[in-house]
Amino acid sequence: MATLSYAQSTDHWLKRKVVNLVELATGREKITSIYQQLKDEPFQVHQFFSRGIQLSRLSLRYNQEMEARIPRDGPLVFVANHPFGIIDGLILCEIAARIRGDFRILLNNRLMKDENLNKLFLPVDFDGTREATRKNVETKKTAQQILENGGTIIIFPS
């Protein structure tokens, strides 16, 4: 199973240590446990996110009138603002899957560690290299095309 971490083997050892400590302090073990349970089940993209919420023992309370106002077609962008870490992204993915069906997720390329989920991802590379810039331009073009075709994108700015 892929390690769920922003730390990369190419990072300076001190950065890896700090990132790992912060992740451990903010619940990486629990998230990893839930992720492992999800990976043990047959993969279905639309079930993955709702099942993740269920395994997290989250109880979602929201204004159903506001949810009803989310457009069912045409271009749409959801933005996760991260007050609760990965949880807000999980919830937005569940909402997008339920209401819109197909969607793509714009996120840090360091999170691209799951071959089943990678097909949903539009990676952003923060390495600052020419190759990163080239990849980011390609991601931007893909995102624009998705929106021009009336698709849905979730921005996961981590």
Spans of features found by a protein language model:
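Loop/helix-junction capping segments adjacent to catalytic residues or to phosphate/diphosphate-binding pockets
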Residues: I86
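Membrane-anchoring hydrophobic helices of lipid-metabolizing enzymes
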Residues: M1-L76, G89-I91, R98-R100, N118-K119
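Conserved nucleotide-cofactor-binding alpha/beta core module
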Residues: R104-N136, K140-A143, L147
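Adenosine ribonucleotide-centric catalytic and binding domains
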Residues: A80-P83, C93-R110
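Residues in well-ordered beta-strands of folded domains
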Residues: R61-N63, V79, L106, P123
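Short, flexible loop segments at the rims of nucleotide/cofactor-binding pockets, characterized by
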Residues: I53-L58, H82, T129-R134
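Conserved Motif II region of HX4D acyltransferases
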Residues: G74-H82, T142-S158
